[in-house]
Amino acid sequence: MGIPMGKSMLVLLTFLAFASCCIAAYRPSETLCGGELVDTLQFVCGDRGFYFSRPASRVSRRSRGIVEECCFRSCDLALLETYCATPAKSERDVSTPPTVLPDNFPRYPVGKFFQYDTWKQSTQRLRRGLPALLRARRGHVLAKELEAFREAKRHRPLIALPTQDPAHGGAPPEMASNRK
C-alpha cells in the first residue's frame, strides 16, 4: 500500500514552498549602486559624513571601495557603517581647545571625504533629472547647440512639398529635369 500520487505531490509542493521562504529569509543583503548608495550612506552616517574608500589603516588586505563592495557584492548595515567618517565631537566635550586653522587653509573638502550638505544639492539635481552637461559651466554652449538641434529635428516636415502646384501648369523643377 503506497502513498497516493496526489498526496505525495502536495507534500512535495508544501516542502518546496517552506524551503523557498526560508532561503529568501537568509539570502544575502541587497546591492546598492549610484544614488541609492549615496542616499543610504547619508542616512546611515548622518552628520558624520562618509568615505568612498576606507583609510589604509583600517584594512590589511587589498582595499576595495564601497562601490565595489556594495554594488557588485551584497551590502549590509555593518559594512555601510565601516565607511562612515569619525563622529564629530559632541558639544559637551570641551577637553581639547578648538583648532585654529591658518588663513590660507583650503575651505573645500579634501580627499574622498564628503559631508551631507555637499551631496544634498547633487542628489536633488539627479532626482530632477538634469544631465551632467547642464551642470558643468563649459557645457552650457554645448547644451544650447544640442537643444537647437533637437528643436530643428522636432520641426522637420515629414515630406518635402513641391514649390509649384502641378495641377496649374507646371511640374516641380525636379520632375522636369528627370524627363529630359
UniProtKB/Swiss-Prot annotation:
Gene Ontology cellular component list: extracellular region; extracellular space; platelet alpha granule lumen
Keyword Signal belongs to the record: yes
Annotated region described as D, given as residue ranges: 86-91
Principal localisation: secreted
Effect caused by changing residue 128 to A: Abolishes proteolytical processing
Post-translational modification note: O-glycosylated with core 1 or possibly core 8 glycans. Thr-96 is a minor glycosylation site compared to Thr-99.
Signal peptide: 1-24
Site (Important for interaction with integrin): 48, 58, 61-62
PROSITE patterns noted in UniProt: INSULIN
Phenotype for residue 48 to E: Does not affect integrin binding. Defective integrin binding and IGF2 signaling
Molecular function terms, GO-annotated: growth factor activity; hormone activity; insulin receptor binding; insulin-like growth factor receptor binding; integrin binding; protein serine/threonine kinase activator activity; receptor ligand activity; transmembrane receptor protein tyrosine kinase activator activity
Region listing for Disordered, in residue ranges: 161-180
Disease field: Silver-Russell syndrome 1: A form of Silver-Russell syndrome, a clinically heterogeneous condition characterized by severe intrauterine growth retardation, poor postnatal growth, craniofacial features such as a triangular shaped face and a broad forehead, body asymmetry, and a variety of minor malformations. The phenotypic expression changes during childhood and adolescence, with the facial features and asymmetry usually becoming more subtle with age. Silver-Russell syndrome 3: A form of Silver-Russell syndrome, a clinically heterogeneous condition characterized by severe intrauterine growth retardation, poor postnatal growth, craniofacial features such as a triangular shaped face and a broad forehead, body asymmetry, and a variety of minor malformations. The phenotypic expression changes during childhood and adolescence, with the facial features and asymmetry usually becoming more subtle with age. SRS3 inheritance is autosomal dominant.
Protein name (record): Insulin-like growth factor 2
Species of the source: Homo sapiens
Lineage, uppermost ranks: Eukaryota, Metazoa, Chordata, Craniata, Vertebrata
